[in-house]
A protein has these predicted regions:
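Short glycine-/acidic-enriched loop or helix-start segments at secondary-structure transitions
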Residues: 6-8, 33-34, 71-74, 97, ...
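Short, hinge-like loop/turn segments at secondary-structure boundaries
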Residues: 39-43, 80-81, 103-105
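Phosphate/pyrophosphate-binding active-site segments
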Residues: 86-197
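Cofactor-binding loop segments of dinucleotide-utilizing enzymes, especially the Rossmann-like FAD-
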Residues: 1, 25-27, 66, 88-90, ...
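Short, solvent-exposed amphipathic alpha-helical segments in soluble enzyme
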Residues: 8-19, 76-81, 102, 119
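Anionic-ligand anchoring segments at beta-strand to alpha-helix junctions in alpha/beta enzyme folds, i.e.
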Residues: 1-58, 188-204
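Short gly/pro/ser/thr-enriched loop/turn and capping motifs at secondary-structure boundaries
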Residues: 28-33, 69-70, 92-96, 111, ...
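Phosphate/diphosphate-binding loops
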Residues: 44-96
Length: 204
């Protein structure tokens, strides 16, 4: 919804003004700068630790233009039991999900309207170092993953697995670079203004 509404800049300004972190769904990628101070990255089973840790501890979650899919919400297990949900969505059906306080509206207009109300209430979140800490922890993890290769020191991240799978995979591809290391390398090497198109038949 943020991408279709071209509301990326409005969302970034909203989050900066009220000290609110945000995470992205796969469909929402490119709507906001990944380098934005408040952008935690992905969310849910296809997300990262920064987005998921902050979402798990949140008292209020604002879903903007999202369908709250199982990937995004970790099959509805990501949030606290008593979390308060707020939705902004042009689809009334999706706005009503998770027993949310709903705003059936365009994402950009909804963000601006919500900002007006928060401004009247002199609202600012109570976060101090939590956002930066979560991002720093993820950066450390990403550095480990970026250097995670099929070498003599390789140890699988998931112990419960078929022991033949990884050796067979390495033999077939004929290389030592893991998917995460390859993606990290691409991210470092591509120009800042590059356009990327991707598709996958399974989890990354």
């Amino acid at each position: 919804g943020v991408r279709y509404s071209e509301a990326g800049e409005a969302l970034e300004k909203f989050c900066a003004e009220f000290n609110i972190p945000f995470a992205e769904t796969q469909s929402g990628k490119t709507a906001c700068l990944s380098s934005d101070k408040y952008n935690l990255g992905g969310l849910g089973v296809t997300g990262n630790s920064a987005g998921n840790v902050m979402a798990k501890d949140a008292d209020v979650v604002i879903g903007i233009g999202t369908r709250f899919s199982d990937f995004t919400t970790a099959s509805k297990s990501l949030f606290k039991d008593d979390v308060k949900m707020v939705t902004i969505n042009t689809s009334r059906f999706d706005a009503y999900k998770l027993d949310a306080v709903k705003m059936v509206a365009d994402a950009k207009l909804g963000i601006l309207a919500l900002g007006d109300e928060l401004r009247k209430a002199n609202y600012k979140s109570a976060y101090t170092t939590e956002i930066a800490d979560a991002k720093a922890d993820w950066d450390k993890e990403m550095e480990i993953l970026a250097n995670y290769n099929y070498d003599e020191n390789f140890k699988p991240l998931i112990a419960a697995r078929d022991e033949k799978t990884i050796p067979e995979y390495v033999e077939k591809i004929g290389g030592v670079i893991t998917q995460t290391a390859a993606l990290a390398m691409i991210r470092k090497l591509i120009p800042a203004d590059a356009l990327c198109t991707g598709a996958a038949g399974s989890l990354p």
